[in-house]
Amino acid sequence: MLSKIIGSVVGTKNERELKRMRKVVSKINAYEAAIQALSDEQLQQKTEEFKARHQGGESLDALLPEAFAICREASLRVNGMRHYDVQLIGGITLHEGKIAEMKTGEGKTLMGTLAMYLNAISGKGVHLVTVNDYLAARDAELNRPLFGFLGMTVGVIYSQQPPQEKVDAYQADITYGTNNEYGFDYLRDNMVFSLKEKKQRPLNFCIIDEIDSILIDEARTPLIISGQAEDSSRMYALINTIIPVLIRSKDEEANKNNEEEDFWIDEKNRQIEISEKGYEKIERFLIQVGELGENESLYSPSRLPLLAHVQAAIRAHHVFVKNIHYIVDDGEVVIVDENTGRTMPGRRWSEGLHQAVEAKENVEIQAENQTLATTTFQNFFRLYDKLSGMTGTADTEAAEFKSTYDLDVIVIPTHEPIARVDMDDQIFLTKLGKYKGIIREIQEIQAKGAPVLVGTATIEASEELSYLLDQEGVKHNVLNAKQHEREAEIIAQAGSPKSVTIATNMAGRGTDIILGGNWQSFIEDIDAVSPEEMARLKAQWQIKHDQVVAAGGLHIIGSERHESRRIDNQLRGRAGRQGDPGMSRFFLSLEDDLMRIFAGDRVVNMMRAMGLKEDEAIEHKMVSKSIENAQGKVESRDFDARKNLLKYDDVANDQRKVIYGQRDDLLAEMDLLEAIKIMHQEVYNAMINQFIPPGSIDDQWNVDGLEDELENEFKIAMPINDWLDEDRRLDEEGLRAKIIETALDRYHSRREQMGEKDAAQLERHFMLQSLDKHWKEHLTQMDQLRKGIHLRGYAQKNPEQEYKRESFELFQMMLGAIKSETVQDLSRVHIPTKEELEALEIQQRENAAHMQMQFEHSDIDNMDGGVERAAVQSRNVVGGATGASVAGAMAGSSDDADPYAGMNISRNAPCPCGSALKYKQCHGKI
């Protein structure tokens, strides 16, 4: 109440910001007359002038008014489009590192060019992020003439892009690409073996288009690069056969505590719980098929993977539904994005869920994966020096944008007042009754001559509605994940008179629906269009446009409410662009998931008590309020889940920064000798401590054990007993110093044999190999720790604090293991010739380039082991972090692959690699 009173007196924060920015707009407009008088050549020269002024110390803020005025004039000359004042305000918002909420059809694409041009003047690069490759390529081509006229280069990044082409795209002044590709390129850049292989420049300025979709809807989406793990396809197929005989509880809440059923489902969180009866039934089956011993249970530590298979299979059968959560296309299970209705080819759920769905659908079961590198969108985009974004719907999530990303949301006024009318929801008893109501509404709208866009939440709902419309003889188009190839064509004509388009959620988002249809799409199909033909087509379109406007514009029908108000607002926002008329209304039923799971019993009982017929609807404020409360609960739950994920990922992110920083140092540092010396001292000290404890007397020393360990681990023979016999005054400190000095002397001697350059190359390869190997293992350990950490709460411990403590301990152990393995490898290495070094480096790159990896996402991570990931597969990853490396091929201890496996070598013979070890102790080691 107090904030409202203060706001009415001094204005809201948004109003104050707009007032400040309008003063800047006045400065921009003051340049217009003088700039209009410039020739094209003079206008183009301004970019070089701005660059010189900026290098001379003038800030981008100071350049903004004139630079925006130049960009606006250039846009008018090149594209025939002049930025409105509200678009200038949006450009200022983006430049200041804020989020511009601009309604659909108000020109976000054109608005973004202002901030992109200004920030490209610094020469540090600007990244424009879109939700899919089509929009990235479309917007790049749309704006390339403008930026080219102004002397700015434009690049586009995409998956499977040739390496040099991608480097060139990142070197451009302005780069377009998807959030996935930027994130995966960041991870790939931190898996390369030389700085020359890196693609990205330091992350400078980023504008995210549809920022709510990327930083809110996909915030719980870890980006994961993974390699293949062991094949468990047989197990998934086996487990799949038992699921149909398990009995699901009919009333989840009422039966949660009885043992009559085998399992029940928490629909809100998409989790399953198995009863004791269910466990016994599953165990009996597994014992019968020989997968479980007579005295074993699913709770046995060694059998926990089996339990995970079972849980994944139950979720696949009873939580994940075909044509809602996924489709089967050409023998593959393809995930459907629930927020957009688009398919996500190549992405895969993790934790065995995707394999379980493949078994359920009886298609080929693909292998699971092991994580090699990972980050989240939340942490990746926070790496940019300046982050901004634009969308039509951000204000409802303003608090989350501020708390998570420190981003303010500025609501940009519309150029023309919004003429769309948003009608009250209509609520029906059943889904069929709701569909009948929707069809009646469509027929009434069609009779007026207006177009209709029907938004559905799932593919299944779109096909059900399509079937019913066919029965009624209503011509229509369907746009869902199965018809994505025709998306642009369908959306282009969705504003034509009497057209009916059914679309899953926000399919087609990013493309405006023009009243009367898009007349320019007809021209694209004609090779050469005469001016007369163009005028005729435009006149025909104008007649249709006027007809649709007279009929009330585009009518939006929502077939159910989404869990998020923001998604509902996005659907409404498809109508009423730039002052056009329009209407929107949502149709609901008590059988809708949102109503069934979240709406209160009071609402349901009230509607049933009214004795409504199936196809009769009510409009009531109490029902609308109940729906809003349900959506608020879901949004709050999702916000908490994202906030919880960030707490845990921040721990991993700090470790990631350390590892990636060390990797960059290794790649950039020419001389690693000093670091190698320190490693030797630390590793040898740690080993000595095991046999000669600090502060101990000589009776407590295990000298024989130390000699054996030095020989076994580092292949160095030290006559420590002889040293002690020769010098009785040699104490613990002196002995420690002598051992380390001897080890370093030996290493220096071997280093001189190799030569400075080759030695440095070998040291770098060993350190990179060890770092990558142990980081990969550490990620797996962190993942396992994270899945079970919530159980610490039952022991009255804080899971978050426990996670921080244990992850730090794991990190320290990993760093110790990297140092120990590096010193060990350098001590055991065969000194190669220059030719061997070159040949092995080529082999390393070839192995890395052909190594199959996966690029993954996770849709849900609520810290209880219920993680779902989606993966994008790549066939060629240059600079992979594993495979036979130079160091591994030469070291006795780095023998991931045996290059001599086919040579029939005796296990007691010397190893062919020249390490002076027996084959069974070197490359033939099992």
UniProtKB/Swiss-Prot annotation:
Please list the cofactors this protein needs: Zn(2+)
Major subcellular site: membrane
Q: What's a Pfam family in this record?
A: SecA_DEAD
Biological process according to GO: intracellular protein transmembrane transport; protein import; protein targeting; protein transport by the Sec complex
Q: Binding of ATP: at which residues?
A: Q87, G105, E106, G107, K108, T109, D512
> For this protein, what is the EC number?
7.4.2.8
Q: Where in the cell is it found?
A: Cell inner membrane; Cytoplasm
Reaction equation(s) it catalyzes: ATP + H2O + cellular proteinSide 1 = ADP + phosphate + cellular proteinSide 2
Q: Molecular function (GO) terms listed? A: ATP binding; metal ion binding; protein-exporting ATPase activity
Textual note on the cofactor: May bind 1 zinc ion per subunit.
Role according to the record: Part of the Sec protein translocase complex. Interacts with the SecYEG preprotein conducting channel. Has a central role in coupling the hydrolysis of ATP to the transfer of proteins into and across the cell membrane, serving both as a receptor for the preprotein-SecB complex and as an ATP-driven molecular motor driving the stepwise translocation of polypeptide chains across the membrane.
* Lineage of the organism: Bacteria, Pseudomonadati, Pseudomonadota, Gammaproteobacteria, Moraxellales
Similarity annotation: Belongs to the SecA family.
Q: Which HAMAP family match?
A: SecA
Q: Which residues are recorded as binding Zn(2+)? A: C911, C913, C922, H923
Family matches, as InterPro entries = Helicase_ATP-bd, Helicase_C-like, P-loop_NTPase, SEC_C_motif, SecA, SecA_CS, SecA_DEAD, SecA_motor_DEAD
Q: How does it sit in the membrane?
A: Peripheral membrane protein
> Does the keyword ATP-binding feature in the UniProt annotation?
yes
CDD domains listed in its UniProt record? DEXDc_SecA, SF2_C_secA
NCBIfam families from the xrefs?
Answer: PRK12904.1, secA
Give the gene symbol.
secA
Sorted keywords for this record are:
ATP-binding, Cell inner membrane, Cell membrane, Cytoplasm, Membrane, Metal-binding, Nucleotide-binding, Protein transport, Translocase, Translocation, Transport, Zinc
Q: Pull one GO CC term from this UniProt entry.
A: cell envelope Sec protein transport complex
**Protein name, entry field:** Protein translocase subunit SecA
